From Swiss-Prot:
Residues that, per the record, bind GTP: 163-170, 188-192, 209-212, 278-281, 315-317
CDD domains: Obg
Residue ranges constituting the OBG-type G domain according to the UniProt record: 157-334
Cellular component terms per the entry's GO annotation: cytoplasm
Record's subunit section: Monomer.
Name of the protein: GTPase Obg
Obg domain location: 1-156
Binding annotation for Mg(2+): S170, T190
Family assignment from sequence similarity: Belongs to the TRAFAC class OBG-HflX-like GTPase superfamily. OBG GTPase family.
Biological function: An essential GTPase which binds GTP, GDP and possibly (p)ppGpp with moderate affinity, with high nucleotide exchange rates and a fairly low GTP hydrolysis rate. Plays a role in control of the cell cycle, stress response, ribosome biogenesis and in those bacteria that undergo differentiation, in morphogenesis control.
Length: 419
């Protein structure tokens, strides 16, 4: 399956159903009164963390997600059915961004509210009072929340395997876990992160084989920054370095990898780290190992020839890796989305664009909400709409701009001539 770790999508929650204008009409019931029912809630959109997924490919193929609309109200004070909520599985480690701000970090197998469905509109039964016992007033359902989101996947791994291309990372992952990554004797065999579950005694942890890093990776060279971000999730780092092959310089390789990690995110250097010195069966190994120990005396090193490693060597590697996690307990910051707090900006209730030919166009989030909510299907609703826009100062502002009788006014889809 194709690995996709970044997509942009649009989510549109369901619109609330419209309230209706209705009056009770039954035999032998004189002046039955208003009985228009309310609209149902629009369906919301949820993301659900799924440990069985490891790619955002489904979103790459489906760029828009629409919620189900609520049903309109019915006579006899019947409320319309709510729109069905949508639950969409996403890989654990998915981050959700709205206008480049992180609003949700999906790290648990639970549901996260992404876009809330619109409230259903009120039917005329709700507008009855002692002065108006037969109101011809109703409301449309509110639009569901509509967001353009960026999704970014950072794999959920406890330990990240890093190193130069063809250093032996994929071989190591295949030995310690149930993963079967592609292994070959050429650079950049691993083109996407590979995950494996490592079992040790009664415990287990997840290890990620990340594509080989080269000098300049933090600036986009090679596999580059595309996959460096996946290391940020890890709690520990294991460097796999070729100590035995000709023309290899383990000291230089280690310094370059650490430098790229630091340039990308300085906090990565605070993680527990060990080095697996690979290819101990080759002639250059002992010379390179001695030089490395002199240069980095405090670095923990595990000697191995991964391609011919025995089971007891593999068990030692697994124990050392698990020890890195025991030293530093897992700390996860969980930030859940709360889209109900993402409100429309009402600081500018409307914007008037006027033209020389007597045409005035009105836009703005507040005026859009008003005209969307109040259906202009009765004289009382028109009067209610008029009172709302007068209250926010729209009519006064049009007069200041020199509007004349007969001029055309457009408020989104609604047009009328000024009188």
């Amino acid at each position: 399956m194709r690995f996709v770790d970044y997509v942009s999508i649009e989510v549109v929650a369901g619109k609330g159903g419209d309230g209706i204008i209705s009056f009770r009409r039954e035999a032998h019931v004189d002046k039955g009164g208003p009985d228009g029912g309310d609209g149902g809630w629009g369906g919301s959109i949820y993301f659900v963390g799924d440990s069985g997924m490891n790619t955002l490919l489904p979103f790459y193929q489906t760029k828009k997600i629409f919620g189900y609309n609520g049903e309109n109200g019915r006579p006899k004070r019947q409320t319309g059915a709510n729109g069905k909520d949508i639950f969409i599985k996403v890989p654990l480690g998915t981050q959700v961004f709205l206008k480049k701000s992180l609003i949700c970090d999906i790290i648990l197998e639970k549901k996260y509210l992404i876009a809330k469905g619109g409230r259903g509109g009120l039917g005329n039964f709700h507008f009855r009072n002692s002065k108006n016992k037969a109101p011809r007033i109703s409301e449309n359902g509110e639009l569901g929340q509509n967001f353009y989101l960026d999704l970014q996947l950072k794999v959920m791994a406890d330990i990240g395997l890093v190193g130069k291309p063809n250093a032996g990372k994929s071989t190591l992952l295949s030995l310690i876990s149930n993963s079967k990554p592609k292994i070959a004797n050429y650079e950049f065999t691993t083109l996407v992160p590979q995950l494996g579950v490592v079992k040790i005694y009664e415990n287990s942890f997840v290890t990620a084989d990340l594509p080989g890093l080269i000098q300049g990776a933090s600036s986009g060279k090679g596999m580059g920054i595309i996959f460096l971000k996946h290391i940020e999730r890890c709690r520990a780092i294991v460097h796999v370095i070729d100590f035995g092959s000709d023309n290899k310089n383990p000291i230089k390789d280690f310094i370059e990898i650490k430098s790229e990690l630091e340039k990308f995110n300085k906090k990565l250097l605070d993680l527990n780290q060990i080095v697996i010195a690979n290819k101990c069966d080759l002639p250059n190994f002992q010379f390179n190992l001695a030089n490395f120990k002199r240069k980095f005396p405090k670095i923990k090193i595990i000697k191995s020839s991964l391609i011919s490693a025995k089971q007891n060597e593999i068990n030692i590697i697994k124990e050392k890796m698990f020890g890195l996690l025991e030293e530093k307990q897992k700390k996860l910051e969980i930030q859940e989305i709360n889209t109900s707090k993402i409100e429309f900006n009402l600081k500018a209730p409307f914007l008037i664009k006027s033209r020389n030919n007597g045409f005035f166009e009105i836009t703005g989030e507040l005026i859009q909400k008003i005209i969307q909510k109040i259906p202009l299907n009765s004289q009382e609703n028109i009067l209610r709409f008029n009172a709302k826009v007068k209250k926010i100062g729209l009519w006064d502002e049009l007069i200041k701009k020199g509007i004349k009788p007969g001029d055309l006014v457009r408020i989104y889809e609604f047009e009328f001539h000024w009188n």
